[in-house]
């Protein structure tokens, strides 16, 4: 599995050229993309500026010598490469297994080309087998948890050891065990309108390409263009 993740990450790095501002994703597959960019910066003199999606990725990129800028200092990003926890046939996805969904979505939004790197196990018919992360403010989190519980969403607080995990943005994550999300777009809108929810892990209609690595090789799936 790790070998497939590495293949997907390295393949995505081929889309990066001199002068680009690139979004650096978070997670076990995006890790290999960042590593390959670091190698190219060092060995090939690749000239890029990175924008990171988590403190973990910032630390990795700094260690590799990749120049970084804050999201607040740029107007657009040429290319962002990130992982995904599930991707359906309509190019909707669930992200946030690494607890970085808010920053990942903030970086994805001004991106001209958004690429996900996955192994074949992440491609699914319907989203929802992977728990859906919902980032919530700490104030009122337990009340919101009860709302989700009453709605039948089977919520659980993301933990780190014996304590609730706190994200880079100082929020909690409530994971929803939904089984199958029949209409990801509608459910995303529902969560968007829920007071106390900062962001959720449904990335609907955002991705442009999905690089899928399997034992049979690598395929690049292109999302249909809107309109």
UniProtKB/Swiss-Prot annotation:
Catalyzes the reversible conversion of ribose-5-phosphate to ribulose 5-phosphate. The active site is at residue 104. Homodimer. It catalyses: aldehydo-D-ribose 5-phosphate = D-ribulose 5-phosphate. Gene3D superfamilies: 3.30.70.260, 3.40.50.1360. It holds the Pfam family Rib_5-P_isom_A. Keywords: Isomerase. Substrate binds at residues 26-29, 82-85, 95-98, 122. This is Ribose-5-phosphate isomerase A. InterPro entries: NagB/RpiA_transferase-like, Ribose-5P_isomerase, Ribose5P_isomerase_typA_subgr, Ribose5P_isomerase_type_A. PANTHER family: RIBOSE-5-PHOSPHATE ISOMERASE 3, CHLOROPLASTIC-RELATED (PTHR43748:SF3). Its EC number is 5.3.1.6. GO terms for biological process: pentose-phosphate shunt, non-oxidative branch. One of its GO terms (molecular function) is ribose-5-phosphate isomerase activity. Pathway: Carbohydrate degradation; pentose phosphate pathway; D-ribose 5-phosphate from D-ribulose 5-phosphate (non-oxidative stage): step 1/1. Belongs to the ribose 5-phosphate isomerase family. It comes from Streptococcus pyogenes serotype M12 (strain MGAS2096).
């Amino acid at each position: 599995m790790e070998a497939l993740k590495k293949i997907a990450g390295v393949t995505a790095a081929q889309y990066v050229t001199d002068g680009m501002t690139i979004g650096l994703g978070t997670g076990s597959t995006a890790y290999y993309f960042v590593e390959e960019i670091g190698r190219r910066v060092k060995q090939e003199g690749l000239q890029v500026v990175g924008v990171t999606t988590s403190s973990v990725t910032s630390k990795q990129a700094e260690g590799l010598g990749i120049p970084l800028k804050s999201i607040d200092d740029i107007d657009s990003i040429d290319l962002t490469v990130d992982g995904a926890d599930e991707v359906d046939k309509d190019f909707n996805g669930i992200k946030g297994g690494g607890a970085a969904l808010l920053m990942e979505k903030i970086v994805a939004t001004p991106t001209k080309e958004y690429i996900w790197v996955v192994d074949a196990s992440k491609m699914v018919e319907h989203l929802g087998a992977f728990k859906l992360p919902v980032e919530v403010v700490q104030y009122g989190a337990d009340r919101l948890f009860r709302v989700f519980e009453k709605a039948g969403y089977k919520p659980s607080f993301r933990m780190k050891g014996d304590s609730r995990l706190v994200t880079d943005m100082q929020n909690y994550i409530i994971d929803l065990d939904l089984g199958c999300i029949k209409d990801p777009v509608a459910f995303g809108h529902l969560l968007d309108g829920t007071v106390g929810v900062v962001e959720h892990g449904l990335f609907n209609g955002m991705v442009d390409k999905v690089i899928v690595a399997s034992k049979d090789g690598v395929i690049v799936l292109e999302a249909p263009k809107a309109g």
